[in-house]
């Protein structure tokens, strides 16, 4: 099976309080990639969602980035309908990396192995390349060192174009396949 992890494609990161023109620009390609996996009999799509609460400004992240965002269950927290496949798992996380991502991947592998085989590849796309994407890529690589981990750079955007490029280079150095 091939797994697509869609990282934090939420309103606040696309066109909300932390949105950027680059984030808006990748939406059509992200949608196309999600549809490819949805239509592939061996494809599985899972999502992460940055998830904060009213106390966000009191957290370590909130003190360093004092912009409330992805407050559950606000509009900004939501994944746009046209990017979400109904009934697909959403891993809610309150920090950059989804600490329970390994458990989700193991569960998906157990549930789907009979029909779709073992994990052949994990592709990771979304926002922001230089924060949450790279964090989740490293978690996946640590858990599945022998499985190809792929990042489609055209389906990612960073806080800035320069930080996006730097994150892609850092992932390349960690044997991540950048396409």
State each model region's role.
Residues 1-91, 110-111, 117, 146, ...:
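Active-site acidic carboxylates
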Residues 12, 51-52, 96, 128-130:
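Short glycine-rich anion-binding loops that position phosphate/pyrophosphate groups of nucleotides
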Residues 57-59, 101-104, 135-136, 162-163:
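Short, well-ordered secondary-structure micro-motifs
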Residues 92-116:
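Alpha-helical scaffold elements lining the catalytic groove of polysaccharide deacetylases
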Residues 98-99, 156-160:
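Short, small-residue-enriched loops and turns at beta-alpha junctions
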Residues 119-132, 150-156:
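Glycine-rich anion-binding loop/nest that anchors nucleotide
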Residues 133-142:
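Short Gly/Thr/Asp-enriched flexible loops that form oxyanion-binding sites at enzyme active sites
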């Amino acid at each position: 099976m091939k797994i697509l992890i869609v990282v934090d494609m939420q309103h606040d990161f696309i066109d909300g309080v932390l949105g950027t023109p680059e984030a808006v620009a990748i939406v059509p390609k992200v949608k196309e990639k999600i549809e490819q996996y949805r239509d592939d009999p061996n494809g599985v799509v899972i999502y992460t969602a940055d998830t904060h609460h009213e106390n966000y400004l009191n957290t370590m992240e909130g003190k360093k980035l004092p912009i409330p965002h992805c407050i559950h269950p606000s509009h900004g927290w939501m994944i746009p309908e046209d990017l979400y496949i109904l009934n697909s798992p959403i891993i809610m996380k309150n920090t950059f990396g989804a600490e329970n991502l390994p458990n989700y991947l193991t569960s998906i592998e157990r549930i789907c192995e009979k029909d779709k085989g073992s994990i052949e590849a994990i592709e990771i796309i979304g926002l922001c390349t230089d924060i949450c994407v790279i964090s989740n890529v490293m978690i996946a690589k640590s858990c599945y060192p022998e499985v190809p981990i792929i990042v489609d750079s055209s389906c990612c955007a960073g806080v800035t174009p320069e930080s996006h490029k730097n994150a892609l280079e850092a992932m390349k150095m960690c044997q991540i396949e950048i396409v």
